[in-house]
From Swiss-Prot:
Family: Belongs to the ATPase A chain family.
Transmembrane segments: 40-60, 97-117, 136-156, 201-221, 222-242
Name this protein carries in UniProt: ATP synthase subunit a, chloroplastic
PROSITE patterns per UniProt: ATPASE_A
Alphabetically ordered keywords of this record: ATP synthesis, CF(0), Chloroplast, Hydrogen ion transport, Ion transport, Membrane, Plastid, Thylakoid, Transmembrane, Transmembrane helix, Transport
Record-linked InterPro entries: ATP_syn_F0_a_bact/chloroplast, ATP_synth_F0_asu, ATP_synth_F0_asu_AS, F0_ATP_A_sf
GO molecular function ontology, one term from the record: proton-transporting ATP synthase activity, rotational mechanism
GO CC, alphabetical: chloroplast; chloroplast thylakoid; chloroplast thylakoid membrane; plasma membrane; plastid; proton-transporting ATP synthase complex
Pfam families hit by this protein: ATP-synt_A (PF00119)
Record text on subunit structure and interactions: F-type ATPases have 2 components, CF(1) - the catalytic core - and CF(0) - the membrane proton channel. CF(1) has five subunits: alpha(3), beta(3), gamma(1), delta(1), epsilon(1). CF(0) has four main subunits: a, b, b' and c.
Function: Key component of the proton channel; it plays a direct role in the translocation of protons across the membrane.
Amino acid sequence: MNVLSCSINTLIKEGLYEISGVEVGQHFYWQIGGFQVHAQVLITSWVVIAILLGSAVLAIRNPQTIPTDGQNFFEFVLEFIRDVSKTQIGEEYGPWVPFIGTLFLFIFVSNWSGALLPWKIIQLPQGELAAPTNDINTTVALALLTSVAYFYAGLSKKGLGYFSKYIQPTPILLPINILEDFTKPLSLSFRLFGNILADELVVVVLVSLVPLVVPIPVMFLGLFTSGIQALIFATLAAAYIGESMEGHH
């Protein structure tokens, strides 16, 4: 009986170990300090960050009293982000505008880069480049940052009294309220990842089948949905932060 039990345990452990090593597609890795780093995501993320930083430098390099076209555009983007933050968070939205704005702009430019930048031209030893948000590692990281942000917002506003929300309106709902905090980052990450991955797959399939006319409307639709996904993510992040500060559901 002991031998059978040990065999089953060994089989389960080895099976789980093999499953944990399963990968979808081919990936390009860097070895840094004994760790495997997903290089594809880092490369494309650095490109997106460089675009954002370069645009910001150009926008604030020589501000004018009478705004130019470029300055007008960036002021419009800032006002838009402030409006989203104020609507979802409330009067204490000010300190959270940089965080919400960073989320929105990074996701927006990442999504659009998948449709506009010719990532496939760059050859890698393994795998291929794609939008940063086309990788589950990126979307989960963004969702976890959002989780840390709304926990910090609630704790900084209410202290340890923040945790009283888990037993409101009745202690019976404690497991459900705890589960809710785990499902928030999951829903954020998988929604963004699924939509961007599906959009790129549809374009790739249509280009391979009908390479001239049909993919163009789908690409324009992809640009639209990419912007909507960035707005949804930023809006929900702001709503979660506002909810944690107000303590309502």
